[in-house]
Amino acid sequence: MGKLSTIGRIFFGIAIAVLGALTIYYDDFPYMLIPPKHSWIPGFAIVAYIFGAMLILAGACIVFEKMIKQASIILGTMLFLIFCFYFIPYQFIKSSEYIHFGAWENAAKELSLAGGAFVIASRYFVNKESLLNRFLSKIISTGAILFSITIISFGIDHFLFAKEAADYVPSWVPYHLFWMYFTGTALIGSGLAVIFKIKVRQIASLLGIMIFIWFAILHIPRVVFSPSADLGSEIASACLALAYSGIAFVIAGGATKKIV
């Protein structure tokens, strides 16, 4: 892997591991990993510990390149199954706001992490002539598309909820609404570019840089100055930004590599 992909892989692995640590520390899942109403799950604390440990292990495997293909495939599959068989039913059955685009934001975050795990796996996957490997190659080849679709949806959110989200921009940055619309445009354009393979290396690199800048100037200060009641959510949001930046860098670094 090139330097850009290596940086992205490490970013993503760290983010996943920290999400796992948060799950164990708070005896609960970060807000985007499963829907909020999960009290029906028997032995929930034990489930949270096991899931958190799996995230830490997967993150460590990704960072240190140990069984990284297997860890990434398992991680991506697990997150994708949660999206399909928990988030989607929850949105239609339990949530009364499923017709509103913004109500799907957390589900999209789950899907983006699943796509990111498949992107990582695709960089280490070597196709062998077996039914299982052909099946796996089809699944992991969707990673960049899944990630790009969610990035586009986040861009649309920046337009739909620009005024509500403008306060997230640091106070010392002028023209808050401009930056909301600029970021939304950049996210939508980047997602479309990756899907349609238009200057993927350059645009994915710029996407990763943009998200990392927001990670540094927006999310880190919010973590540092957050009240204790909100600290877990702010750390989780920072992890998402770091993960997205990492995924974009891995896509950029592997833009010339044919997935087999």
Go through each PLM region and give its residues.
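Membrane-interface interhelical connector segments
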Residues: 26-40, 132, 159-176
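Extended, low-polarity transmembrane helix blocks
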Residues: 1-28, 44-57, 63-160, 178-185, ...
